[in-house]
Amino acid sequence: MIRISIDVMGGDYGPEATIAGAARVTEYLPNIYFLFYGLEETVKPVLKKYPCLASISCFCPTESYTRMDEKPSQALRNGRGKSSMWHAIEAVKNGEADVCISAGNTGALMAMSYFCLKMMAEAERPGIAGIWPTLRSESIVLDIGATIGASANQLVDFAVMGAGMFRALYHTEKPSVGLLNVGVEEVKGLYAIKKAGMILREVQLEGLEYKGFVEGNDIGKGTVDVVVTEGFSGNIALKTAEGTARQIGEILNSAMRSSFFSSLGYFLSRGAFRTLKHKMDPDRVNGGVLLGLNGIVIKSHGSANADGFASAIRIGYTMVHNGLLKKITADLRRFHQNKQTLFYKEDKATENEKII
């Protein structure tokens, strides 16, 4: 049984989307159980609309919820032990749930998750990993906005965690990994990026294949399975891609309605356009995963509808089913052991050269 705690109050649509999304996944996800957290007067009327959830869920009323405009520090101070978001995260900490999902305030979710679950011993900093539609299939990009800036060691941790997530979702034994940079040449880029590349080249790990630097246009091409960057660049890349997709959609829609022959062309090509729409639909890959914590937390888009929230649930379910946390913990531990051994040998070799 996979247990999923949900902050029902999060997002633009609240319970109307979160509970409806939970009801939809019952059609294709077996052995699932939900813990719903929210305000009783708001949630119970919506729950009554979905009798399919009655036997596979429980409702846990809370005193408050986290508003979308609250600062992380304010949300943590006001919501600790009270809000629906806090209780949903705490359920993972207490072993009552396997994964927490919220469409609420991103900063508040990061702060509460960090404070409640704490970091993995092997990881320095959490990162948000997003699933990115590409020409090949899907890639994972992280960090897409958890924090600003990253050291070489933190970028390396992101690479290891992202590869573990890719294996958990897509059953690829050795995902390819690239570092986002301003060019593919090894001499280009910030020191932290070049240092991270050097570490990934030198320290071998069975769970990933390092392919070197990649550029922004490689993300959409699907050049690698996992693209690693720091949160500032990652968030800009994400928002740029989302805006470009909407722009293309609006341009196509306008062009198809511009004349009779354009409309006829659209009618004849509607199957291809449906495929394009499905491929680029953000709801299909909705859900940013907070990696590096002692528990799985997923941030759904605040604007996600029921289908989008169902996708976030499906992602969380799949990662729990395939043992994401165990994979990441083992990979990080093995990687850092290999790194210590390698650089210890290099230091010894340097000392011997000095003696000679």
Curated annotation (Swiss-Prot):
Superkingdom assignment: Bacteria
Record EC number: 2.3.1.274
Pfam family membership, one: FA_synthesis
Assembly mode: Homodimer. Probably interacts with PlsY.
Reaction equation(s) it catalyzes: a fatty acyl-[ACP] + phosphate = an acyl phosphate + holo-[ACP]
Family listed: Belongs to the PlsX family.
GO biological process: fatty acid biosynthetic process; phospholipid biosynthetic process
HAMAP family in the cross-refs: PlsX
Compartments, as annotated in UniProt: Cytoplasm
SUPFAM superfamilies attached to this UniProt entry: Isocitrate/Isopropylmalate dehydrogenase-like (SSF53659)
GO cellular component: cytoplasm
Keywords (A to Z) from UniProt: Cytoplasm, Lipid biosynthesis, Lipid metabolism, Phospholipid biosynthesis, Phospholipid metabolism, Transferase
InterPro entries in the cross-refs: FA_synthesis, Phospholipid_synth_PlsX-like
Main location class: cytoplasm
Stated role: Catalyzes the reversible formation of acyl-phosphate (acyl-PO(4)) from acyl-[acyl-carrier-protein] (acyl-ACP). This enzyme utilizes acyl-ACP as fatty acyl donor, but not acyl-CoA.
Gene Ontology MF annotations: phosphate:acyl-[acyl carrier protein] acyltransferase activity
Pathway: Lipid metabolism; phospholipid metabolism
This protein's name: Phosphate acyltransferase
